[in-house]
């Protein structure tokens, strides 16, 4: 269910971004991941676990595709290969590093606590998205920052 949640929305995430804007889709991703955290607090029975994993996957998809979409606006055409390769390498290297510690963290803190630790990161993401939205709405104010 989690993997389906991660990749199945890719068929329509681009359309959602085109229709509603990348920042709104990314905010939806933050909301879905927050829903995932709240769902984990209801228990580890199968329905809670399954719905939580779907929310996690779709939220990840909206943020990942949204972030990749934003990345394409930050470099010149001549920098495309290097920028995308650096982005992919960073994502996969961080994922690899986190994979090595995941079991120990789960054993030490437990499922619900690990998910709760996601909340500050989601708050940072929401603030960053809001800041970017403000910069896009008020370009002159952004120049003064």
Model-derived segments and spans:
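Structural signature of the two symmetry-related core transmembrane helices
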Residues: 24-39, 119
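Paired small-residue
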Residues: 36, 47-55
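Intracellular juxtamembrane helix-capping segments at the cytosolic ends
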Residues: 62-75
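A membrane-interface helix-boundary motif in multi-pass transporters
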Residues: 104-123
């Amino acid at each position: 269910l989690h993997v389906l949640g991660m990749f199945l929305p890719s068929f329509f995430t681009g359309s959602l971004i085109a229709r509603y804007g990348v920042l709104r889709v990314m905010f939806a991703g933050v909301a879905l991941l927050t829903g995932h955290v709240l769902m984990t607090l209801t228990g580890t029975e199968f329905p809670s676990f399954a719905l939580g994993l779907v929310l996690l996957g779709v939220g990840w998809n909206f943020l990942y595709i949204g972030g990749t979409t934003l990345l394409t606006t930050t470099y010149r055409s001549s920098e495309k290969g290097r920028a995308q390769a650096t982005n992919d390498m960073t994502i996969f290297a961080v994922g690899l590093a986190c994979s090595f510690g995941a079991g120990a963290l789960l054993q030490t803190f437990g499922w619900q606590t690990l998910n709760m630790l996601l909340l500050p990161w989601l708050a940072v993401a929401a603030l960053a998205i809001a800041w970017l939205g403000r910069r896009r709405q008020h370009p002159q104010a952004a120049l003064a920052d």
